[in-house]
Amino acid sequence: MSNIEKQVGELQEKLIAVNRVSKTVKGGRIMSFTALTVVGDGNGRVGFGYGKAREVPAAIQKAMEKARRNMINVALNEGTLQHPVKGVHTGSRVFMQPASEGTGIIAGGAMRAVLEVAGVRNVLSKAYGSTNPINVVRATIDALANMKSPEMVAAKRGKTVDEILG
């Protein structure tokens, strides 16, 4: 499991995993490679991509392109989360909660990469169930997408932010 990082313009790109896969055909096995990447602007935008090709660089390039096309906005609160959130994808479950300044990113493997490129600086998190990188990344992005800022909740309920926060 490698973790390569690049800066392109204002986007941070991270390579989470490269995997060799094979397809068995009559004449033998056809080898190819898959790559899982995440990109983010470090300020609340994050996306992931999964690419597959006969060569590693081509797989990584495809994954990066897909990640750039597949970005979501995340409502951050001064470098941490708005509230505790849960995310699920197939067998992976993730739980993340806001942390005070100076805590850092307490997260493992694939989840850490997603949180870093999203711009989260302080968070406590835990992955339960399957720790397959693809499923963990999807669950993490699901959790971040489900996070709502007080402004979003207030607008939805037709109230002011002060009424929501108490």
Curated annotation (Swiss-Prot):
The keyword Transmembrane helix does not apply. One of its GO terms (molecular function) is structural constituent of ribosome. Keywords: Ribonucleoprotein, Ribosomal protein, RNA-binding, rRNA-binding. The keyword Ion transport does not apply. InterPro entries: Ribosomal_Su5_D2-typ_SF, Ribosomal_uS5, Ribosomal_uS5_bac-type, Ribosomal_uS5_C, Ribosomal_uS5_N, Ribosomal_uS5_N_CS, Ribsml_uS5_D2-typ_fold_subgr. Pfam families: Ribosomal_S5, Ribosomal_S5_C. One of its GO terms (cellular component) is cytosolic small ribosomal subunit. GO terms for biological process: translation. Residues 11-74 form the S5 DRBM domain. With S4 and S12 plays an important role in translational accuracy. Belongs to the universal ribosomal protein uS5 family. Part of the 30S ribosomal subunit. Contacts proteins S4 and S8. The N-terminal domain interacts with the head of the 30S subunit; the C-terminal domain interacts with the body and contacts protein S4. The interaction surface between S4 and S5 is involved in control of translational fidelity. NCBIfam families: rpsE_bact (TIGR01021). This is Small ribosomal subunit protein uS5.
